[in-house]
């Protein structure tokens, strides 16, 4: 949600910002101003009618005291007319306000000026790379590697067929040592983020109500990307939703900031716009696990510094696992709707001979805070101001598993366990 006064006072700034997103939304500013004018006009009409009703109501008593029944009758007619006008104007006010709020709730955030302008991923800008991709002769992809590894009864450790029989496409069942490797990755990530990077581990709901998704910006525009369970509950597409909503409708003290949360949860996405993309393997699943990072800070300066810190925390996971990666600054047309600035981390996948996204870290400004009414007091008795929020993957566990399998594969099909994970694997150094 945006401050309508800010749009009213500087419409060109909003028009230009939405035009930079290449979303075709620049003209929406005119629609906003039109609805705003209708709402203010109706509000004024209702207030004027209320004032007329109150004034004439007082005069009725005076007319009756003077036994001027004709004047009293005239005034009562005016009061009745004012009540009708109030009802009509009130209805018009409510309708205009609802239409205005609905329009504002569906609009994306404003990109920062420093974000490069572009229409899609081709406009993203590489910031740096880390590590050298390993030279692997005839690398196999993770799906082939996982299916070739056998668990009990000779069943594949990465079993897409079993998952499909119970759930359909874009699901997987992991067995044996691959299951342990997935758990090891999640525990390693959580330990790193909590013991070294200052994040507080949380256990949060993965079923949330409409208002939680409105707060973080997935609703109303992206409902088709979500799984709905009941009339008012949805499965979370990311723990960002639950972690960010921890400060919903709260007024924090400045001394409490920054807040840093992390959680390991299953995530659920319909992948409505991904038909035909990454249909094989674990890259794009309806259900996957992720370690999420969320930060709550006071203002833009702190938010931009926190974005660098958060992205570095995510990068450290890849460094400890010795997985080559690069950091990309996303352009205006490729950023998520709630972001003002986003870095993507992309990990090297030998089978594809390219980098693939494994983490996305975003600074959202006060975009989510306004929708959640999350505020803080800069001073003990100061007027509350909106907090600023950030979120990032630290990391997507399934995609990290994919990267480990592909980058640590051996010629015989076995997988060397990264040194950082050996303690989490009970000393197991090779999966075969």
From Swiss-Prot:
**EC numbers for this chain:** 6.1.1.11
**Which transformation does this protein catalyse, written as a reaction?**
tRNA(Ser) + L-serine + ATP = L-seryl-tRNA(Ser) + AMP + diphosphate + H(+); tRNA(Sec) + L-serine + ATP = L-seryl-tRNA(Sec) + AMP + diphosphate + H(+)
What does the entry list as the binding residues for L-serine?
238-240, 292, 393
Which parts of the sequence bind ATP?
269-271, 357-360
Print the keywords alphabetically: Aminoacyl-tRNA synthetase, ATP-binding, Cytoplasm, Ligase, Nucleotide-binding, Protein biosynthesis
Where mainly located?
cytoplasm
Q: Name one GO cellular component term.
A: cytoplasm
Query: Quick one: which pathway?
Result: Aminoacyl-tRNA biosynthesis; selenocysteinyl-tRNA(Sec) biosynthesis; L-seryl-tRNA(Sec) from L-serine and tRNA(Sec): step 1/1
Q: Which GO terms describe its biological process?
A: selenocysteine biosynthetic process; seryl-tRNA aminoacylation
What's an example of a GO molecular-function annotation for this chain? ATP binding
Domain note for this entry? Consists of two distinct domains, a catalytic core and a N-terminal extension that is involved in tRNA binding.
Q: How does it assemble?
A: Homodimer. The tRNA molecule binds across the dimer.
Q: What does this protein do?
A: Catalyzes the attachment of serine to tRNA(Ser). Is also able to aminoacylate tRNA(Sec) with serine, to form the misacylated tRNA L-seryl-tRNA(Sec), which will be further converted into selenocysteinyl-tRNA(Sec).
Query: What is the protein's given name?
Result: Serine--tRNA ligase
């Amino acid at each position: 949600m945006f401050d309508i006064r800010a749009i009213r006072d500087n419409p060109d700034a909003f028009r230009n910002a939405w035009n930079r997103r290449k979303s075709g939304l620049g003209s929406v500013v005119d629609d906003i101003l039109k609805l705003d004018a209708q709402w203010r006009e109706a509000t004024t009409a209702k207030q004027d009618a209320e004032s007329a009703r109150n004034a004439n109501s007082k005069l009725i008593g005076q007319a009756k005291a003077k036994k001027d029944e004709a004047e009293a009758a005239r005034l009562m007619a005016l009061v009745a007319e004012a009540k009708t006008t109030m009802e009509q104007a009130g209805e018009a006010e409510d309708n205009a306000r609802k239409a205005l709020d609905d329009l504002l709730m569906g609009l994306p955030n404003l990109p920062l000026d420093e974000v490069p302008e572009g229409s899609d991923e081709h406009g993203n800008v590489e910031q740096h790379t880390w590590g050298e991709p390993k030279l692997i002769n005839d690398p196999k992809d993770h799906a082939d590697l996982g299916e070739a590894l056998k668990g009990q009864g000779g069943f594949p450790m990465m079993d897409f067929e079993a998952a499909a029989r119970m759930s359909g496409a874009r699901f997987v069942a992991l067995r044996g040592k691959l299951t342990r490797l997935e758990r090891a990755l999640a525990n390693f990530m959580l330990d790193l983020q909590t013991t070294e990077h200052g994040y507080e581990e949380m256990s949060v709901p993965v079923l949330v109500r409409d208002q939680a998704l409105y707060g973080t910006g997935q609703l109303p525009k992206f409902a088709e990307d979500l799984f709905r369970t009941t009339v008012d509950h949805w499965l979370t597409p990311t723990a960002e939703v639950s972690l960010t909503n921890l400060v919903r409708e709260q007024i924090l003290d400045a001394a409490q900031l920054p807040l840093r949360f992390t959680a390991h949860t299953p995530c659920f996405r319909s992948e409505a716009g991904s038909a035909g993309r990454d249909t094989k393997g674990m890259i794009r699943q309806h259900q996957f696990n992720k370690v999420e990072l969320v930060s709550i800070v006071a203002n833009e300066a702190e938010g931009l510094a926190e974005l660098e810190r958060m992205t570095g925390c995510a990068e450290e996971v890849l460094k400890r696992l010795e997985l080559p990666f690069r950091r990309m600054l996303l352009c205006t047309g490729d950023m998520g709707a709630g972001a003002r600035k986003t870095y993507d981390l992309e990990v090297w996948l030998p089978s594809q001979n390219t980098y693939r996204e494994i983490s996305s870290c975003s600074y959202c400004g006060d975009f989510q805070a306004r929708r959640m009414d999350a505020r803080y007091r800069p001073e003990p008795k100061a007027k509350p101001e909106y907090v600023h929020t950030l979120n990032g993957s630290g990391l997507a566990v399934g995609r990290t598993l994919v990267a480990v399998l592909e980058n640590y594969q051996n010629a015989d099909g076995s997988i060397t366990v990264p040194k950082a994970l050996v303690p989490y694997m009970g000393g197991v150094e090779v999966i075969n």
